[in-house]
Amino acid sequence: MPELERMLDLLSEDELRAVIKESSKDDVVVSIIEGFVRRKLEFTPDDIRTETAILLSNADDYIFLEKSMFDSSLEELFPENKALALLAETVFNGFYDRAEMMVSMGMLNEARLFIRSVAEAIRHFIGDESITLIKLCGESASRFADELESFLNSDDPLGGFHKK
């Protein structure tokens, strides 16, 4: 949909959020999300297919949990902050796998930039306050939030992040 991509370039982040909230057509919404994330992170749609929900979510207003890789809506299974934490961890681990592959190929700097851009995108869209809220959602979620913060403040090649 080239016309949709042209429209994306003209919209601000707030305008994109408004379009997404008002749209009831999943294919259009998914295209908008993919276009937005592709522009912001310079990834291809295949890199982010089902994981894009977290990047346009926050603790108060998360979107399309049913678009995640889980069969049932996380909204029905968890309080919103637990769902957010689980989605964030799933997304981050998926990108971390790719970064580990880059490291194994000797692409250390590329891996570090790749994973940091994802971590910063997560922080940008859910906010520092939401990272704090994630810590209240149980031991695993708290560990994830601590490690995300540690990664963002680290100068180590991969930030010392440990997959769970």
Model-inferred region functions:
Residues M1-M7, D14, A18-K21, K25-K164:
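Eukaryote-biased, non-catalytic alpha-solenoid scaffold regions
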